[in-house]
Curated annotation (Swiss-Prot):
Encoding gene (name): nps11
Entries under SMART domains matching the protein: PKS_PP (SM00823)
Residues bound to AMP: H244, N347, V348, T352, L432, V433, G434, R435
Chain positions with O-(pantetheine 4'-phosphoryl)serine modification: S613
PROSITE patterns documented for this protein: AMP_BINDING, CARRIER
Domain Carrier, residue spans: 578-664
Entry protein name: Adenylate-forming reductase Nps11
Alphabetical keyword list: ATP-binding, NADP, Nucleotide-binding, Oxidoreductase, Phosphopantetheine, Phosphoprotein
PANTHER family registered for this protein in UniProt: ENZYME, PUTATIVE (JCVI)-RELATED, PHENYLACETATE-COENZYME A LIGASE
Family matches, as Pfam families: AMP-binding, AMP-binding_C_3, NAD_binding_4
Amino acid sequence: MADPSFSYTLHYPPVDGSLLFPEIIAFNAEHNSNVPFFVFPEDGSANGVVSISHLEFYRACHRVAHALRPNRAGPDGEIIAIIAMTDTIQYFALLVGVIIAGYIPFPMSPRNSAAAVSNLLLKTSCHRLITTQHSLQPLLDGIKSELGSFNFSFQDVPCLAHIYPKLGLETIDDPFEPFPARPSRPSASEVMMYLHSSGSTGFPKAIPQTHQTVIHWCAAAPVVDTKLYPADTCLGVMLLPSFHTLGIICSLYLPLITLRSVSVYAPTSYNDPKAIPVIPTSENILEGVQRTNCNALMAVPAFIELWALSPSAIEILKSLRFLASSGGPLSEKVGNALASVGVPLVNVYGGTECGGLNSMFRRKDEVCDWVWINLSPRVMFRWVPQGEGLYECQILQSEMHRVSVENLPDVKGYATSDIFLKHPTKEGLWKLVGRKDDIIVLSSGEKTVPAPMENTIASNPVVGGTVMFGRARNHVGILIEPRQGFDVNIDDPKQVAAFRNRIWPEVEEANKAAAAFSRIFKEMILITRPDKPLPRTGKGTVMRKAAVTIYDKEIDALYDTVEASTTVNKDVELPKDWSEESLVVWLGEHAARVNSDKKVDPEVDVFEQGFDSLTATFLRNRIIGSLSSSTDSNVRTTARQIDQNIVFSNPTIKRLSQALARVVSNPQFTGKEGSLINRKVELENTLAMYSEGLPGTLSPQVEQPNGDGHSCHVVLLTGSTGGLGSYLLASLLENEQVSLVYAFNRSSKDGKSSEERQKAGFEDRGLDIALLSSPKLRYIEGDAAQDKLGLGDATYDKLRTSINVIIHNAWRLDFSLSLSSFGSNIKGTRNLVDLALSSPNAPSLRFLFTSSISSAQGWDKSKGACPEEVLFDANVASGGSGYGASKYVCERILEKSGLQASSFRIGQISGGQPRGAWSVTDWFPMLVKSSLALGALPVAKGVVSWLPPHAVSQAILDVAFAKAKPPPVINLVHPRPVQWAALMQSIGDALVHNNLLTKPLPIVAFEEWFSRLEQKAIGASADDFKEMPALKLLPFMRMIAQSDKSIRKVTSDGEAGGFVVFSTTKAQQLSRTMRELAPITAEDVALWMKYWASKGMFM
């Protein structure tokens, strides 16, 4: 629909070569001064939209030139690299401003590795880099290290407020000083700027762009044909990186030449130069489309496929004049579905080496041909037959279109290696079907090279042939033809499973050498039929494309099955009836199957018998699969009612059988309520049981001094070998006020001594191992849940009479378990309290408990931040995890003990100095690893108050040794939180910087990310859990996703993921560490990533 408010007279700049690129900028400033160039949404502005005119953009570019080269000092032609995270309107003013200054810009991806960037700089003799040092410091440090003695300098990007002083309000009457003009006009053959290739097969390559090349690209079909749409067309380019060829063509050349405006995100750095630009999500892109009345959009397949799942998103897409897809193959199934309901899809094709090659203009009656590319008649193509009706596309140099890279042996031109299929009836239409080198391009844009993996798998003697597939899918699969004599009846599930198991060692070997997104899941092995062998050439080589074609239906069915079903388990027969007694036996057999065939005691918590989150999830899947195989339709219906947490809520086989019996008899019951014990009542009963007989107060005695600087403290530290425990031990051993430390730990199942484990813990975290030789250190092994802590009388009595500080840090870390699974931990806490009460030092003894913020996640957020007080309403913990409930119980036990006790509600502990150590089994590292397999990073609205372990340990000691009596509760969360979005941007940068990815992952809303994860949970295998460990925490991730969806409707920022905000007033009063703690930075993130990589997390 046309915009009636659009009333500009347009004077199109010529693209015949009479004007060069900088002159086109000036032409528009003079002849199209008020025509909108960029538009972005802004509350409070006219119509809610701000427009940057061609005049204002022109002047912004000149202000950049002044800032970079005052008075045009020095010689022309210096190459200036640009690696910056800036707002779009700032980036392009910078890019053009460098040209106007007489320099040659070289925009680079900030997601390149330091080695890749350094190689580009050296190859082009570039000695100067304009950047955003505040957001890219790890990368810049790496570049410095790589360049060594190479003469090089960094310069910050001119701030947005300087180059756009009126930001949307500038007129021709406002003061302005143009940058001094160049003495002579550049020749068309001069290099105007550099771009670089993607680097998918090695380091990115610098690709020069001459003035003539740029003008040819400005006159190319993707740009000029957009003038065929009405003059009020506004193209959404929010998703396009400003350094990328497509971003430059669509966000810069197109509005300059066609005078069609482009919609971008509102700038964030006008008032805060260090603010991170808006991170694209599928949600905020469509929001920008609506708020700026945008009627055309550029997007990548991953986002389009997400929008295809949302009816409301489809309605928005249907209203566009065109939706252009680029950056990877869009699934034809998705594209056809969208086109069938009226979404005006267009495929965009081109490259940095050759520019844009097809028109984005399509008539409405051509929508059904969306997958076919209408190549530009301005470009001279050569089609080289590849057999099977396929052709390689080559672009030949011509007077109307120049390529930037020449690689043909006979004529000037560029061989793309892209393989096309000619439309059977419509002249000029071509379909991109793959690459000459058979690279598989996934829907995320990631590329899988199949040959090495196929060859590895084919080395198994039972394998006769292999062909990988997965183009436009989110993961790959493989066709395997059994060698003659090893035929498989593919209709027999047992034979199929046996064959997969037989070849699995070679598949695992292939997976080890592959990128995360290229790994093959066991369920994605498709075995060929004997009556449909793989097609081969005369030489015996498998014809890859023909093979995928003849198995097209089976491949589609396989993806549908893997993504939508739970594996049926028939190795355990269904019970004869659904009574609790029969179910105890039946569930016991299933439990043994997932527990290495070890018999499980039905009366004992399964998590005390070796189960973890993974085995619990497998047990649930087996239950669902078995129920699904029943001949009783009511039982099959029951399979869909099983709650995700049924095993965690019912952690003994007996309780699980009770819950399952109720589900079968009443499908409305899901098992979510476990045995229907009210959680609050269970929590209060547990508290009553373990606090029985506590004095409440102690008789006053002469207290021993605290905090006087003398070596007077004898400390009992539990759980010293773990993460926080190691930092606590190091801090204690370094502290001059401590005379003796008892490091109390349970004996190890693997037979390693406490000394060995402690040394390993210090080494892993980079702590000073020399401290472990301190004469102040004593190791004790015992079990706090046992009488007298599992110690002999003499050792127990020595502890009782000597210690005056207890730091209780040992605890089971599993957020999936119910309260009853933490009974031994709670009992151990009570035993330690009894130890303290029996001590002659009891009145002055300090008992410090490392609790958790999860003990108060039920706090009423409407009351503000959770205070540093004992919370007597058990509801604050009854609705959360068993882990948090158990910590709450112990906070209350300590409150009733009469001791000088403090419970530290500790928030998320991140990695810390000196190595960035952060356990790869913690939820956030698991999220990061899973994101690689899912092809996206999640963003949540709000802040994170994570803090490093050395800060936690020191804050605890600050309180432990203070002169004043400690308060009963202290909240330890970061007093200066950071935005989740900024943190995730740093994660993305660090993944690329550490060469874990060749290009950045898209960042999507947490809800979308979780949707991908949840789909993977259906029928998840052991390999799925290895690739996506976040599957183990599905309920936790679901909670964050649901909370984030609600939070996005609120304007103010709280804690990301819907977590409670905690007051730190007392913590900062009592601890200098907390008062002076610096926020998390990109440097911290870089340390985490380096540590995770060193632990093999990404292998």
